[in-house]
Amino acid sequence: MKIKTRFAPSPTGYLHVGGARTALYSWLFARNHGGEFVLRIEDTDLERSTPEAIEAIMDGMNWLNLEWDEGPYFQTKRFDRYNAVIDDMIVAGTAYKCYCSKERLDALREEQMANGDKPRYDGRCRHSHEHHADDEPCVVRFANPQDGSVIFDDQIRGPIEFSNQELDDLIIRRTDGSPTYNFCVVVDDWDMEISHVIRGEDHINNTPRQINILKALNAPVPVYAHVSMINGDDGKKLSKRHGAVSVMQYRDDGYLPEALLNYLVRLGWSSGDQEIFSREEMIKLFSLGAVSKSASAFNTDKLLWLNHHYINTMQPEYVATYLQWHIEQANIDTRTGPELAELVKLLGERCKTLKEIAESCRYFYEEFDAFDADAAKKHLRPVARQPLEVVRDKLAAITAWTAENVHHAIQATADELEVGMGKVGMPLRVAVTGAGQSPGLDVTVHAIGKTRSVARINKALGFIAERESQQ
């Protein structure tokens, strides 16, 4: 059996984390079986579908590196195909034209609800032999089987059964001639030879209707798997109030795609006690049988932990390719200062996101206007003048500018003045970075460079002198 899966988002908004997880599971299942993965844009909702949403979905898929083998297909470009199939069904008697007015259908619904019945179409036009003009407005309905049941073996939830008596004759073509979502999906899955439909649990109620249409077309029925929803950490459905829900918002917030993928794959799937999965491991180990039927809770702290792990374990050069975007957003000129891969090594341990790195690195590349007030008040005092003068001269005298030699200069200053390293290090840190926190002082001063470091120490000495004159 040829394995072929699809991800079929509706372009009415951004690619959210729930959709991204569904895409990931479909992609992994196809890759695990050496199959194919199709991207299909279900844009039949003409009023809500937008080009911006299509672009956002494609951007999200590309950023996550979930490459597709076919597509993207667009349902709006296949209306002729859908309508041809509907016309054939009318001839075959598996679909029929319905001329019931909106007023009649509204009255029927009100009557059924007043009687405590489930609102449903009563099938009046299914058995009608009334003559209607060719140009009289009508919809087309699917003639759903009226007895028996639909049973499908959900690969995550087990067997699910629906009575056909619970399913009315759904509309498959509107009065304006446009086919409806549930019908387009069926024809697409048939034409594209989809073997496995992996989607959210909100589609479970669509499945029996789609299976009945497939059977009416004598088309093969794919295997279905419905993934549970993602909740916030408070147990309620994930929404913007829980934080970012758009995939590209996580990009903007400084997450690596590997971290988000690793986090999403574990939201409902597991392989023993393993937490960290490379893309190759995900492909090798993934199975639908190991996907939980219970809802998952989104935990941002866990995602942050994973992101920090990947920033510090992936090749710095690779991480730097993603950091570049954040540097550009921060409008930092990196032409003078350390390479971005070096910056990843310098700040990766201290920062959990790439955005944090970009926000923390400016002093490596640009001059700062003022010292942090609290840090300067505490460390740029008259008592720091001599340590700064001595360490400045020792740094200026270094011929081979290495982090090791910088360390020796700082240590030699402390030894010469017979003071602790902190008496030299803290004023020096504030002098060269403008603040009271940084990576290791030797690597920081080395990355800033000799000329710039000496100039900043002189600036700090000037600050101390001015402070002394005001006392």
UniProtKB/Swiss-Prot annotation:
Keywords for this protein: Aminoacyl-tRNA synthetase, ATP-binding, Cytoplasm, Ligase, Metal-binding, Nucleotide-binding, Protein biosynthesis, Zinc
InterPro entries xrefs: aa-tRNA-synth_I_cd-bd, aa-tRNA-synth_I_codon-bd_sub2, aa-tRNA-synth_I_CS, aa_tRNA-synth_I_cd-bd_sf, Glu-tRNA-ligase_bac/mito, Glu/Gln-tRNA-synth, Glu/Gln-tRNA-synth_Ib_cat-dom, GluQ/Sye
Keyword Transmembrane helix: no
Residues annotated as binding ATP: K240
Entry's cofactor comment: Binds 1 zinc ion per subunit.
Catalytic activity: tRNA(Glu) + L-glutamate + ATP = L-glutamyl-tRNA(Glu) + AMP + diphosphate
Enzyme class at the top of the EC tree: ligase
Cofactor(s) required for function per UniProt: Zn(2+)
Localization, UniProt: Cytoplasm
UniProt main location, coarse: cytoplasm
EC numbers for this chain: 6.1.1.17
Short sequence motif named 'HIGH' region, residue ranges: 9-19
Motif ('KMSKS' region): 237-241
CC terms in the record's Gene Ontology section: cytosol
One annotated GO biological process: glutamyl-tRNA aminoacylation
Nucleus recorded as keyword: no
PANTHER family according to UniProt: GLUTAMATE--TRNA LIGASE, GLUTAMATE--TRNA LIGASE, MITOCHONDRIAL-RELATED
Family: Belongs to the class-I aminoacyl-tRNA synthetase family. Glutamate--tRNA ligase type 1 subfamily.
Function (record text): Catalyzes the attachment of glutamate to tRNA(Glu) in a two-step reaction: glutamate is first activated by ATP to form Glu-AMP and then transferred to the acceptor end of tRNA(Glu).
Protein name, UniProt field: Glutamate--tRNA ligase
